[in-house]
UniProtKB/Swiss-Prot annotation:
Substrate binds at L140, V141, S142, G143, G144, D173, G186, D190, N279. Binds 1 Fe(2+) ion per subunit. Its cofactor is Fe(2+). Fe cation binds at H118, H122, D308. Gene3D superfamilies: 3.30.420.40. PANTHER family: TRNA N6-ADENOSINE THREONYLCARBAMOYLTRANSFERASE, TRNA N6-ADENOSINE THREONYLCARBAMOYLTRANSFERASE, MITOCHONDRIAL. This is tRNA N6-adenosine threonylcarbamoyltransferase. It comes from Levilactobacillus brevis (strain ATCC 367 / BCRC 12310 / CIP 105137 / JCM 1170 / LMG 11437 / NCIMB 947 / NCTC 947). It is found in: Cytoplasm. One of its GO terms (biological process) is tRNA threonylcarbamoyladenosine modification.
Length: 347
């Protein structure tokens, strides 16, 4: 880069749920800063995220996160190329804080504003591991979503399978609560699963159905019924075995559906993304399944970027910007935002 050439720097915002995050990303794949202010302790006593509490924390943290992100990256507003923000899906109040902050910065400093689908951000976290090669497939597993997303080319998405009820991450939190685990329960359940055995034969709903959709409500109900029955008769169940049996059922369904999707949609990469992508059991199973696949390479989002963060938003924003995806100051939060087949510019 010549001394007069301006760097491509995106200031990215993420506030869709219970993490306030601001990052500075260079060229879509280099993290100069990624500030994350978590709210987990504030929500633990409620057993889950309380939208009003989340919004209040975002208001308190957003300005500090901006200042810290710029300071850590050692850049100023004049150095920025654009501003990016998650505008959905998520909690409407939480989203509005990030959207408002991003629009304010963009307007005040005359910078382009890039709207980002939160779920696309999760997928593009893989860009910090290696470039995404197309066609690609993403198994997107989080607290609110469980989806198989086919990507024939850059900036194109097609959901070919999704949960019909509970998301996998939501099921983890619910069974964790039954076992007395604080929110979020995923890591503890995963740790216990590695210490136990698959002794409870929980159902694997839709595993053999002729589609790529998922269902975890039946598994959750079977788990709750098993523990409730044990309580009624005074039986103590091994929590590690319960966790192992539950996790095995979840992983079996996710892996089976993914393998069948890959058979119908040949791709160069399978990207594992979302909060549940940090699950050791799932990462190990997919790695084993794809070890013998000569054409599809598994790319796992970095553990530190599996949860909500602005770095992943900046990664996809860079791609969206190259495709002319821009918004103006009329951009609003869209809590029910879905994937478009093509990520068209927001008007």
């Amino acid at each position: 880069m010549s001394p007069t050439e301006k760097r491509n720097l995106i200031l990215a915002f993420e506030s869709s749920c219970d993490e306030t995050s601001v990052a500075v990303i260079e060229d879509g794949h280099r993290i100069l800063s990624n500030i994350v202010a978590t709210q987990i302790k504030s929500h633990q006593r409620f057993g889950g995220v309380v939208p009003e509490v989340a919004s209040r924390h975002h208001i308190e943290e957003i300005t500090l996160c901006i200042e810290d992100a710029l300071a850590e990256a050692q850049v100023g507003y004049d150095d920025l190329t654009a501003v990016a923000v998650t505008y959905g899906p998520g909690l409407v109040g939480a989203l509005l804080i990030g959207v408002t902050a991003a629009k304010t910065v963009a307007f005040a400093h005359n910078l382009p504003l890039i709207p980002v689908n939160h779920m696309a951000g999760h997928i593009y976290a893989a860009r910090y591991v290696e470039p995404i090669e197309f066609p690609a497939m993403a198994l997107l597993v989080s607290g609110g979503h469980t989806e198989l997303v086919y990507m024939p080319a850059e900036n194109q998405f097609e959901i070919i399978g999704e949960t019909r009820d509970d998301a996998a991450g939501e099921a983890y939190d619910k069974v964790g609560r039954v076992m007395g685990v604080n929110y979020p329960a995923g890591k503890t359940v995963d740790d216990w699963a590695h210490q136990g055995h698959d002794t409870f034969k929980f159902p694997r709903a839709m595993e053999k159905d002729d589609n790529f959709d998922f269902s975890f409500s039946g598994l959750k109900s079977a788990f709750i019924n098993t523990t409730h029955h044990a309580d009624q008769i005074g039986e103590t169940l091994n929590k590690q075995d319960l966790a192992a049996s539950f996790q095995q059922a979840v992983v079996d369904v996710l892996a089976e559906k993914t393998q069948r999707a890959l058979a119908d949609y040949p791709v160069k990469q399978l990207i594992l993304a979302g909060g549940v992508a940090a699950n050791r059991g799932l990462r190990e199973r997919l790695a084993a399944d794809l070890a013998s696949n000569p054409t599809t390479h598994l790319v796992k989002a970095p553990l530190k970027l599996c949860g909500d963060n602005a770095a992943m938003i900046g990664a996809f924003a860079y791609v969206a910007y190259q495709h002319g995806v821009l918004a103006d100051t009329s951009l609003n939060a869209d809590p029910s935002l879905e994937f478009d087949w093509v990520a068209d510019p927001v008007k």
